[in-house]
Curated annotation (Swiss-Prot):
Protein name, UniProt field: UPF0509 protein ESA_01586
Coiled-coil regions, chain positions: none
HAMAP family: UPF0509
The organism's place on the tree of life at top rank: Bacteria
InterPro entries linked: UPF0509 (IPR020887)
Species name: Cronobacter sakazakii (strain ATCC BAA-894) (Enterobacter sakazakii)
Family affiliation: Belongs to the UPF0509 family.
Upper taxonomic lineage: Bacteria, Pseudomonadati, Pseudomonadota, Gammaproteobacteria, Enterobacterales
NCBIfam families per UniProt: PRK13658.1
Signal sequence range: none
């Protein structure tokens, strides 16, 4: 069962922030979408079937 490495996650977020500071919004969004997909894939490996997910409070 794979786990999230906090240091690797922080490094990837730093990379996205650097891309945003450089003004390349398209690449930053693309990198966030890749990261999200990878995290969701890991999360789905641990989910119970039929378990309902609640949205985070900051999601619209």
């Amino acid at each position: 069962m794979p786990t999230v490495n906090p240091q690797q996650l922080a490094d990837r977020i730093d990379t996205v922030l650097d891309i945003l500071v450089a003004g390349d919004y398209h690449s930053a969004i693309h990198n966030l979408e890749i990261l999200k997909a990878e995290l969701l894939a890991q999360s789905q490996q641990n989910d119970e079937p039929g378990e309902k997910k609640q949205k985070a409070p900051w999601e619209i």
